Amino acid sequence: MKRKKDRDIEKGYPTAAFVAKLRRLADALEKSERFAIQIAGERIFVPSDAVYTIEHEREGGAEEVEFQITWTRKGR
């Protein structure tokens, strides 16, 4: 299996596009199916057994909420 290059990308989306992605994610979760998403030109497949967490950060006057999805790629 070809090794994928490391990357760390943050991509902004308009509200309507973000909502559509969340809806597709919720639909996949409810059906216990994998979730496919394209981020900055790369298609990502999130397995149905991924781990979902919500993180909250506060520093100074800034706050951040991150919805995180983590998994280990098979065959590594």
Kindly give the residue locations of the regions a language model identified:
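N-terminal intrinsically disordered, cationic/polar leader segments
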Residues: 2-8, 34-38, 42-76
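Terminal, regulation- and interaction-focused segments at domain boundaries
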Residues: 1-25
